[in-house]
Amino acid sequence: MILVTTTPSVDGYTITNYQGIVFGEVVSGVNMFKDLGAGLRNMFGGRSQGYEEELMRARNEAIAEMQRRAEAMGAHAVVGVDIDYEVLGADNGMLMVTASGTAVQISRRA
């Protein structure tokens, strides 16, 4: 399992090698029924559970993709992770989530 952290280091470990920058990207379409529900909540207030679930799913997939790519590079961890969100498409019907960080090899401190 590849460790993932937003910090520049992993507590209790020493970074022994920097493998390079690694990304995981997911582009997801938004369902029209979720759009309808979200539009009503925008007018009347409240949270859009459909959008929140889609956002969480896309974020988890982007992190998992980043972990797979880091593992393919021979890394043990990804440090300095940042997650970005972007709305795409003429009708803003697509969501892009990007996870990025530095793939590193680590060893436990003595």
From Swiss-Prot:
Pfam families: YbjQ_1 (PF01906)
Domain of life the protein comes from: Bacteria
SUPFAM superfamilies: YbjQ-like
Family per similarity comment: Belongs to the UPF0145 family.
Listed NCBIfam families: PRK01119.1 (NF002224)
Name of the protein in its database record: UPF0145 protein Blon_0093/BLIJ_0092
Natural source organism: Bifidobacterium longum subsp. infantis (strain ATCC 15697 / DSM 20088 / JCM 1222 / NCTC 11817 / S12)
